Swiss-Prot record:
Name used for this protein in its record: Chaperone protein HscA homolog
Keywords: ATP-binding, Chaperone, Nucleotide-binding
Gene3D superfamilies attached to this UniProt entry: 1.20.1270.10, 3.30.420.40, Actin, Chain A, domain 4, Substrate Binding Domain Of DNAk, Chain A, domain 1
HAMAP family noted in UniProt: HscA
The species this protein was found in: Actinobacillus succinogenes (strain ATCC 55618 / DSM 22257 / CCUG 43843 / 130Z)
Source organism, top-level taxon: Bacteria
Taxonomic lineage of the native organism: Bacteria, Pseudomonadati, Pseudomonadota, Gammaproteobacteria, Pasteurellales
Length: 614
């Protein structure tokens, strides 16, 4: 059975109220959460005004996340999960082959995925990631003091489907509505506003604490395409720290004797690295030894690692079929790109000055926040980030072969719109959803995209069910259609690419046909609408006669039946006004019948009740 529309999509009570959304950079070493306030993206700080949350989870008597968990890492390494991002979406065999020296107690799950044995039992990487996301969500809700409508979470461009789905599952555990997973390099480019700049090739050089990633993107018509990715999962700022620590041990002649001393030495090395970002030399003190490190010495130590990263850049460019001179912008991401030597070497390699004006630790989260702000509808259409539009209206078939447009043509994507529909017949338990594309008024003149059926609608009177149909088009032009019966929550959905197989010429022809046939289409629509209304009225009267025909005398019954036959004949014709008149005639013929049925219902309802009880 096709659909009968009952409601226009209404605006919220406060359509211009700013909707709360966040962007999360779920990092290997650290994670951040950001939002857009007063038109500006900003990082949300924790209770101690810190922007970063260490991606560390400790399982003890309680679950601890962040800095507090990090302090327990050296004392209780088996229950302190660090860099879980390396494990998510991977099989246990893959994890053990890639990272043979991890201190965790691994347990194989039934599907071959890793579980980590902790003081609180076995936990999956998804659950660990979920704890980090819960921490970030709580931080955001505290700072924003309101309900979050959704989140954009960033993932590496090279993440496969399993890793992306696992990230979504972690977000679900944290109670988050994921608006979109966004590639980290794309988020960084968005933060710099490159999405609205000239088209061309962008390189994103991401050197974090534990990993290095290079991504080559092409911007075309507001859409980022990942041309190639590369990197090194064992190269990052932590390696810089270890090189400095080894240098200090060698210069001082003092080797750390236990884990505590090793940790203190690494912390000293990290402080030295940070200080050398701004100073040409740094004074050092280690267990009674006094020394000094020059920036040139530091550059010499890390030179080999930086060259390794540039070799990965060269391979990525080759994979993309792009020359170094074709790269128009280079975006720096990750705290380790603050090192002046790294910036100089990258600039020399790509033959242009890298973009460094945004804090490289924050740039990905800021881009995610900008995207989230748009996806919840805070930006007007002319400021949409992703500039693709829907070339032809997307609609749904309603009763009588009519088209109800859900998303009009030229709407900027991503976009989501919904309308409510109801059943046409008593006891109807299923509904056919026919998705169409085009500008014409009748289904037969539009392009059919997909069909699916919503089953499990509770049997009720015609018009009593409420089915919400949602059309959502993502940034890649993929249309998801979901139909949900509101009282039970039962739903069904389908995905389709509206642009698949559609040429520019066909779009032009369809638009031209809609303009040329506009008058005839409106007339056909009015006729179809009157036919639908006539059939609805006929169905209702026949059902009433089946139950209460005895309320009419022979003459009255004959009058009603004659009006029914007349309307049935008229609705098979093509005279819209005649059908309209026939509906009015049947309505007039059944008014007394309707009044008697109402009286009967009232008497039945009051049967057996005393006057005092009323």
């Amino acid at each position: 059975m096709a659909l009968l529309q009952i409601a226009e999509p209404g605006q919220s009570a406060a359509p211009h109220q700013h909707k709360l959304a966040i962007g999360i950079d779920l990092g290997t070493t650290n994670s951040l959460v950001a939002t857009v306030r007063n038109g500006q993206a900003e990082i949300l700080l924790d209770e101690k005004e810190r922007p970063l949350t260490p991606s560390i989870v400790h399982y003890g008597d309680n679950v601890t996340v962040g800095y507090d968990a990090g302090e327990l890492a050296s004392r209780d390494p088996q229950n302190t999960i660090i860099s879980v991002k390396r494990l998510i979406g991977r099989s246990l065999n893959d994890v053990q082959a890639r990272y043979p020296n991890l201190p965790y107690r691994f347990v194989r799950s039934e599907n071959g995925l890793p579980l980590l044995g902790t003081a609180q039992g076995n936990v999956s990487p998804i659950e660990v990631s979920g704890e980090i996301l819960k921490k970030l969500t709580a931080l955001a809700q505290h700072r924003l003091n309101g309900e979050l409508l959704g989140v954009v979470i960033t993932v590496p461009a090279y993440f496969d489907d399993a890793q992306r789905q696992s990230t979504k599952d972690a977000a679900k555990l944290a109670g988050l509505n994921v608006l979109r997973l966004l590639n980290e390099p794309t988020a960084a480019a968005i933060a710099y506003g490159l999405d609205s700049g000239r088209e061309g090739v962008i390189a994103v050089y991401d050197l974090g604490g534990g990993t290095f990633d290079i991504s080559i993107l092409r911007l075309s018509r507001g859409v980022f395409e990942v041309l190639a990715t590369g990197g090194d999962t064992a190269l990052g700022g932590d390696d810089f720290d270890h090189l400095i620590a080894d240098w200090i041990s060698e210069k001082s002649g003092i080797q750390p004797q236990d884990d505590q001393q090793k940790r203190l030495l690494i912390e000293l090395a990290a402080r030295t690295k940070i200080a050398l970002t701004d100073k040409p030399q740094v004074s050092l003190s280690y267990q009674g030894w006094q020394g000094e490190m020059q920036r040139e010495e530091f550059n010499g130590l890390i030179s080999g690692l930086v060259k390794r990263s540039l070799m990965a850049c060269r391979r990525a460019l080759k994979d993309a079929g792009i020359g170094q001179s074709e790269v128009q912008e280079v975006v720096m991401v990750g705290g380790s790109t603050r090192v002046p030597f790294v910036r100089d070497q990258v600039g020399e390699f790509f033959q242009r000055r890298p973009l460094t004006s945004i804090d490289p630790d924050k740039v990905v989260a800021l881009g995610a926040a900008i995207q989230a702000d748009i996806l919840v509808g805070n930006k007007p259409d002319n400021e949409m980030l992703l500039l693709d539009v829907i070339p032809l209206s997307l609609g749904i078939e309603t009763m009588g072969g009519l088209v109800e447009k859900i998303i009009p043509r030229n709407t900027t994507i991503p976009v989501a719109r919904a309308q409510e529909f109801t059943t046409f017949k008593d006891g109807q338990t299923a509904m056919s959803v026919h998705v169409v594309q085009g500008e014409r008024e009748l289904v037969g003149d539009c392009r059919s995209l997909a069909r699916f059926t919503l089953r499990g609608i509770p049997p009720m009177a015609a018009g009593a069910a409420h089915i919400r149909v949602t059309y959502q088009v993502d940034a890649d032009g993929l249309l998801s259609v979901t139909a949900m019966e509101k009282s039970t929550g039962v739903q069904s959905s389908i995905q389709v690419k509206p642009s698949y197989g559609l040429t520019d010429d066909e779009i032009t022809q369809m638009l031209k046909a809609s303009m040329e046939n506009a008058k005839e289409d409106i007339g056909a629509r009015m006729l179809a609408e009157q036919r639908v209304e006539a059939r609805r009225v006929i169905e209702a009267v026949l059902s009433a006669l089946l139950d209460d025909q005895d309320l009419l005398n022979d003459e009255e019954l004959s009058t009603v039946k004659n009006a029914l036959v007349s309307l049935d004949n008229l609705q098979q014709g093509t005279d819209t006004q005649a059908i309209k008149a026939g509906i009015k005639a049947l309505d007039a013929a059944t008014q007394e019948f309707a009044a008697r049925r109402m009286d009967k219902s009232i008497r039945r309802a009051l049967s057996g009740q005393s006057v005092d009880s009323l």
